Curated annotation (Swiss-Prot):
Its main location: membrane. One of its GO terms (molecular function) is proton-transporting ATPase activity, rotational mechanism. The keyword Chloroplast does not apply. Pfam families: ATP-synt_B. The chain crosses the membrane at residues 12-32. It is found in: Cell inner membrane. F-type ATPases have 2 components, F(1) - the catalytic core - and F(0) - the membrane proton channel. F(1) has five subunits: alpha(3), beta(3), gamma(1), delta(1), epsilon(1). F(0) has three main subunits: a(1), b(2) and c(10-14). The alpha and beta chains form an alternating ring which encloses part of the gamma chain. F(1) is attached to F(0) by a central stalk formed by the gamma and epsilon chains, while a peripheral stalk is formed by the delta and b chains. It is a single-pass membrane protein. This is ATP synthase subunit b.
Length: 156
């Protein structure tokens, strides 16, 4: 193998080509590779953050669902208590109304009984005086008749 001027010329051209590539071609290629590497790393970080956010969102949704169920159960329990309270109040009101009506009816019965007793006393007194007049055969004056009826009614 002969080393001649062509080989030296080619070596110099190759060396200039390598310097040219190192100066003008290689830096943009390296920059593009580094930028691409940074974008990929950022994308992986974003994916990891999104996965963590998704997991947190699932946990938060589960917690809110549990809280909503607990709140719904509490509302149902309060509604049941209120319904029982309303039923008890209605029962107490009905009982009180029944007792009031019973007392009112008892008072009316007593009043009617007293009225009937008074009327019966007056009738008995009148009958007694009439019977006494017939037995005695004489009439008793009105004043004596009134006193006798009052006395007899008081005794009965």
């Amino acid at each position: 193998m002969n080393i001649n001027a062509t080989l030296i010329g080619q070596s110099v051209a190759f060396f200039i080509f390598v310097l040219f590539c190192m100066k003008f071609v290689w830096p943009p290629v390296i920059a593009a590779l580094q930028e691409r590497q940074k974008k990929i790393a950022d994308g992986l970080d974003a994916a990891n953050r999104a996965a963590r956010d998704l997991e947190l969102a699932h946990e938060k949704a589960g917690q809110q669902l549990r809280e909503a169920k607990a709140q719904a159960a509490e509302i149902v329990e309060q509604a049941k208590k209120r319904a029982n309270q309303i039923v008890d109040e209605a029962r107490d009101q009905a009982r009180a109304e029944g007792e009031r009506l019973k007392a009112q009816a008892q008072a009316e019965i007593e009043q009617e009984l007293n009225s009937v007793k008074d009327a019966l006393r007056a009738q008995v007194g009148t009958l007694a005086v009439t019977g006494a007049e017939k037995i005695l055969g004489a009439s008793i004056d009105a004043n004596a008749h009134e006193q006798l009826v009052s006395k007899l009614a008081a005794e009965i």
